[in-house]
Amino acid sequence: MAKTNISPGMQQYLDIKKDYPDAFLLFRMGDFYELFYEDAVKAAQLLEIGLTSRNKNAENPIPMAGVPHHSAQQYIDVLIELGYKVAVAEQMEDPKQAVGVVKREVVQVITPGTVVDSAKPDSANNFLVAVDFDGCRYGLAYMDVSTGEFCVTDLADFTSVRSEIQNLKAKEVLLGFDLSEEEQTILVKQMNLLLSYEETVYEDKSLIDGQLTTVELTAAGKLLQYVHKTQMRELSHLQALVHYEIKDYLQMSYATKSSLDLVENARTNKKHGSLYWLLDETKTAMGMRLLRSWIDRPLVSKEAILERQEIIQVFLNAFIERTDLSNSLKGVYDIERLSSRVSFGKANPKDLLQLGHTLAQVPYIKAILESFDSPCVDKLVNDIDSLPELEYLIRTAIDPDAPATISEGSIIRNGFDERLDHYRKVMREGTGWIADIEAKERQESGINNLKIDYNKKDGYYFHVTNSNLSLVPEHFFRKATLKNSERYGTAELAKIEGQMLEAREESSSLEYDIFMCIRAQVETYINRLQKLAKTLATVDVLQSLAVVAETNHYIRPQFNDNHVITIQEGRHAVVEKVMGVQEYIPNSISFDQQTSIQLITGPNMSGKSTYMRQLALTVIMAQMGSFVAADHVDLPLFDAIFTRIGAADDLISGQSTFMVEMMEANQAIKRASDNSLILFDELGRGTATYDGMALAQAIIEYIHDRVGAKTIFATHYHELTDLSTKLTSLVNVHVATLEKDGDVTFLHKIAEGPADKSYGIHVAKIAGLPKSLLKRADEVLTRLETQSRSTEIISVPSQVESSNAVRQGQLSLFGDEEKAHEIRQALEAIDVMNMTPLQAMTTLYELKKLL
């Protein structure tokens, strides 16, 4: 960019921009935020705003674009949503009083991970994640700047780091080390994350006390440093650092959560049709966030699960009190976000009114909880801090009709401050005084249309038309001359005006100071407000789960220590809700101590995947503490769920369905324990038939012999059902069908034993394929089944049988000497000693095709 003959103002812009090269710089100039040079060109395209130039007649005009300061937030939101950073430079002094260039400074850098204000507020968390690496393990810290939530853990490998970032749905990742090229590709290209870097650890360790590893400390410290550097203020709302271990929760990868539609429907990317949608009867934004967290991280502690169950049971048993509780929670605003706005110095009168309204509801909520008269609920009661003194301050100080801005006045209630009341009285009575002066002068002067007007330039004045100029009294003095009239003042009017203007200015200044003082007082309560927010959120989620349990007739699950799964008449909770109770066909699921694998066969569209997902959702809901969709449930506590359900290529990373399958299978067999749950649907379908079958069998055997996890393996390879004869912990089940007069009905019920056929052509018929095509497919199927039966009787003869056949002049098996010679040559070329089992299977398959 050409920067010759730069003005002092533009030099100031360039000096500031130099410190923020990776951000759009919004440069406050009067009522606009201006952008220049490359920022202006790019922003004009992204924001669809006009592009002009600052010095149009210069040899090298400076590109310029701007947005009004009062609507800047909506433009900032667009840039942040697109993954950019925005640095906001404000005027630090009154331009009218400035000597030379107005002093400007960047007051905040807004990034995708540090959004606090938004024109489109979202109740969901917005986590900023920091990752550090010590050469052995990874430290991962995350924070929601808008709520103050702050957590840290350590992880063994980059795969775990990736999964945790995905689970947190982060948009920005802060790194304290250099990534490999492959890792960079994963985070930037595959996960579409903004990467930021920080080398410095925050000096103040008060927020990160605790028994942490070195890499956890550096990850948390660098995260704190970055947040303070971008927000440029003390963040009193940040909560004490919480250390957590992945193993403390039911572990699930992002792919598993996606395939089970836990927080959003995988097909629509919407909340509707997800478990989150089903369970969400929360009344507060805080409750919504906490519910999502519970779904993301079910518990593995039986004691903690039973504690949640007990409270839900108490709520279920008291319909009237629970209804009152739900209604009271509707009056609770987002305390966490309001606290952060106070901490950031951005809380306006409406924010404080919302906080006050919430605090006014708390005593009612506490009284309702006390009425349940239950020891488990009493723990929640004891955690509720009503903060009556803060509620009183807001109620008596802030006018209930106060505007959303602090510059318009009318914020503070009458009676709160004597000086403010005096100034308001002067302004109120001054209006009456002016009316009295107007009436008196009209009568004394004889000017019947004499009136007093006001504008900013001339203040209060008498308006006299030219036709009445001869009647103007001597004590009037001229203030302005117009074409058809003149404006006059009097000493009395000037005195009243002075008193009113002084009162207005003093009132405005005093009211602002009072509000800032009140906001500072509110800030001292932030820690107590955050604790209250957590308790109210917990109450909200528990009442939500109680409402859902009652509405859908869910039951309280039991847990055992002997690895037994018993689900009687279980339902897929989400599918049932979408279809309706009358339409849904329940299924029982049973694994005794000896059974670790169910091999399920059956037609497409018959309900195999739903059966598998039903088990997963039942486990997740149970370990959340929720009641579940069944007549009776008794489960072991699982430590992890691994799934491969549904075929999909990973187009961004260029991985095929088969590769994705193998990678997910690898994660399962490497990480699963005998306390895990594995759900594999049609594994191996992305490759050749015999390859797929060989891999499927090998994986089943590996899980059976080495892992021992409870597993449901759905397959179309009917040959695999024979594994039940040699794998003692494997049982066959199938989806029952009813075949009559050529028509097939899928019963959607699981029965013991293997399926007899797949009914693929019948599914094609349902899909509406042409009759001629279906007829041809039936012919081909009959032929293939005949060939299959004929080849099944061919077995490898023993060495004795072979020699006897030669002596007796046995006829050629192939009936074709030329083909026999071809096969003999192929056999002789095989290096048996150096073949892998998979190569041997493939070669055998190729030889079979020669028959």
From Swiss-Prot:
PROSITE patterns: DNA_MISMATCH_REPAIR_2. One of its GO terms (molecular function) is damaged DNA binding. NCBIfam families: mutS1, PRK05399.1. Gene3D superfamilies: 1.10.1420.10, DNA repair protein MutS, domain I, MutS, connector domain, P-loop containing nucleotide triphosphate hydrolases. GO terms for biological process: mismatch repair. HAMAP family: MutS (MF_00096). ATP binds at G602, P603, N604, M605, S606, G607, K608, S609. GO terms for cellular component: cytosol. This is DNA mismatch repair protein MutS. SMART domains: MUTSac (SM00534), MUTSd (SM00533). InterPro entries: DNA_mismatch_repair_MutS, DNA_mismatch_repair_MutS-lik_N, DNA_mismatch_repair_MutS/MSH, DNA_mismatch_repair_MutS_C, DNA_mismatch_repair_MutS_clamp, DNA_mismatch_repair_MutS_core, DNA_mismatch_repair_MutS_N, DNA_mismatch_repair_MutS_sf. Keywords: ATP-binding, DNA damage, DNA repair, DNA-binding, Nucleotide-binding. This protein is involved in the repair of mismatches in DNA. It is possible that it carries out the mismatch recognition step. This protein has a weak ATPase activity.
